[in-house]
Amino acid sequence: ARVISIAGEDSTASTISPYATVSESPGYIRAYFTTQVDNSVATIEQAQALGTNTNDTIAAYITSAQNTLDIAAYNINNSAIEQAINTAIANGVQVRYIAEGQNANLGFSAIDDSMPIHFRTDGMGSGMHNKFIVGDRDDAQNAFVLTGSTNFTTGNLNTDPNNVIILGDQSLARAYTLEFEEMWGSTGMEPDPANAKFGASKSINTPRRFLIGGSPVELYFSPTDGTTSAIL
């Protein structure tokens, strides 16, 4: 969409920008931490530390998907998450996976080899450092985005201080799908490496502002969206 201002015979127009409407989703926002947190400084509600149960929480969301799962993850070697992906595939869920090709990704040896995987490799833009899952993007009541700082590795989940953020919102899920499919190179089940874009090669094509459960949420993808400036 764009804004156009007209005064007499003169007019000016803004650049074309993507926008998202408010969805009919539940609108929950849940944040979890892999290590203990100091709740003495909480101002609204106490943060929740899942500890070694973080992988089970991620696995539960994966297996809750009914139709589609798009996963973009820097690295994976956690058995609970691997098994959850296998369960989703066995349940008929369409699963697509983007991985950083320079990592070990040892977990793939335990995942159903029918799952299509697109590896970001040298010559395909900068490294793929995402950690997100989009579930059931076309179902307003079940759509979710799971993201955060943690890789899907046992070390990141059980030892390192990390976080997991889960949002139940279809508009956000569709925005993440735009980002996923730009790296995937297609809208189908098979990736198109010739059309895939990573890093600075990506377009600025995702909405930035959302209203989720009555709370304003902003979305930025590095390096194209001016993420550092938005944080500052």
Segments predicted by a language model, with ranges:
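Short Gly/Pro-enriched turn/cap motifs at secondary-structure boundaries
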Residues: 120-125, 155
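Extracytoplasmic
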Residues: 127-129, 214
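Beta-strand-rich modules
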Residues: 1-8
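Internal, well-ordered alpha/beta segment that forms a basic, Gly-enriched binding/recognition surface
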Residues: 132
